[in-house]
């Protein structure tokens, strides 16, 4: 099994690669489909995995991942435990702005098996962005896909003058203004 590293391969020209990790296959497919449908000025390659580490056999075929998105289903404790185990298989350099957590199912709080505060603490601990999304709504999936594409473009270095290191400060300032 191979640890995922951000800088061990050459970047692709005018392209970005994303790794979606989560136990819910339907959520991964919905999000990937929505991202591929969106108009964009660069090529997007999306790889999906239920958990990390990735199998070593196909390592030579994999692109350099510009961003890793962890999907956490708040209705499943297994989802959280799988993500926690997967985080240890990720190179620490990814946590320099190239990791995002997407929590799903938070709209029905009484059915949540995973506390929202736990997921917030997880994202804060890893200095990563946290997005909330309801995959029952097509509009919400589209909005999440658009936001992830904007972040991916920055992580891939396709936005001049902006580094993935700035994503945390950009996202925290937008979260503060959204609260009012």
UniProtKB/Swiss-Prot annotation:
Coiled-coil regions, chain positions: none
Keywords: Centromere, Chromosome, Nucleus
GO CC, any one term: chromosome, centromeric region
Subcellular location: Nucleus; Chromosome, Centromere
Pfam families: CENP-M (PF11111)
Superkingdom per UniProt: Eukaryota
Protein's job: Probable component of a centromeric complex involved in assembly of kinetochore proteins, mitotic progression and chromosome segregation.
Name the UniProt record assigns to this protein: Centromere protein M
Biological source species: Xenopus laevis (African clawed frog)
